[in-house]
Amino acid sequence: MNLSKINTLLIASFFLFLTATVISHPQASFEASKTGLSMWWEVVFPSLLPFFILSELLIGFGIVRFVGVLLEPFMRPIFRVPGVGGFVLAMGMASGNPAGAKLTARLRQENQISRVEAERLASFTNSSNPLFIFGAVAVGFFQNASLGILLASAHYLGNLAVGLTMRSYGRKEEQHLRRKKTIPFPSVKDALHALHTARLAEKRPLGKILGDAVTSSVQTLLMVGGFIILFSVFNRLLSVVQLTDVLSVFTKGALTLFQLPTQLDIPLLSGMFEITLGSKLVSETDVSLLQKAIIVSFILGFSGFSVQAQVAGILSETDIRFKPFFIARLLQGVYAAVFVMLLWKPLYTAWHDPYQYVFKSLNSSDMSTAFINGWNLLVQIGPAVTLCALFTYIIIFSYRLTNGTKKG
């Protein structure tokens, strides 16, 4: 039996097992589905939709090309990606997973970047957003806003470290391309010219651009929601059928190798599937805060198989390969964990110096309140935003379907 047939058999067996487990444990599957749906409905959809729509509009109106010309002298020498990568990096950090992959795929579809450049770009522009790191993890799970500064710093430095590491990726594939020896200093005139050229090349009317931005964004988020629910169910079923204990042998071995407490084996395994659940379980473990921070930082950097599956689904619409992205997630997990250890004293221990107690208490309290209020507001208005967006999507889709039928 060749490797291809073995691969097919393994995939078929896995999904057969998953289906049988769902049927045999309907209550656990239902509860896990509700948990995943609630997360998508209340938080993921409303937090990502505005960024997705605005990004589509910025690409459609040529503003991304304007930014790209200005950032070319910085992004090209440092990360070996075009200037538009700076826009993707900023939007990816602000909005969170999987925005970086979504924007990278769009730029590749627009032929603004090569395949190798897209693979480099996707590797370091996907990250958790600050609201999740501070509001959900630091304040929500650990009740410690100061920890958010450490986790966010390590997370985003890990992103940049991955970008620097991946800049050497694909050199052989680019040997045939002729690159300019010197990159000119950014010119506003050239940037405006690129903006105008891109706008003239866009033949769609304003209404069509707006409609496409909404429908494309909603369709992507529907797919993201499906993956969140699927992995929520899968993670729960692993625990129900006690496979978690079997798989935790690997995480326990890794923890022992790095001299970390083996009590973190189940939380680490859960986090490798879904970051929210894993981070919550880590916060409840009875080990030192530094050890918890190291594992949570790795989980945030690795992003979890749930997010990686979302990214794989997005990248599958292009010729961008998933393997470099997966390797980059492993690297970011390791880098982020190392940065936590390096920054522990300057960013956390020093912040909790007893001589700085008054300053610490004031800022920590204000920060906690701000992020708690922000997170609670998102959860409160999230369902309404999701419902309105889905209603708008249905109207646009129905209108286009009706017009298409009439023309046919």
UniProtKB/Swiss-Prot annotation:
To which species is this protein native? Bacillus subtilis (strain 168)
Q: What is this protein called?
A: Sporulation integral membrane protein YlbJ
Localized where? Answer: Cell membrane
Write down a Pfam family by its short name: Gate
Q: Which UniProt keywords apply?
A: Cell membrane, Membrane, Sporulation, Transmembrane, Transmembrane helix
Q: Explain the purpose of this protein.
A: Required for spore cortex formation.
Q: Which domain of life is it from?
A: Bacteria
This protein's gene is called ylbJ
Q: Which InterPro entries match?
A: Gate_dom, Spore_IM_YlbJ
Gene Ontology biological process terms in this record: sporulation resulting in formation of a cellular spore
Per the record, membrane topology reads: Multi-pass membrane protein
Query: Membrane-spanning regions, if any?
Result: 6-26, 43-63, 81-101, 131-151, 214-234, 294-314, 324-344, 377-397
- GO-annotated cellular components: plasma membrane
The induction text for this entry reads: Expression is controlled by a sigma-E-regulated promoter which needs the sigma-E factor for the binding of the RNA polymerase and subsequent transcription.
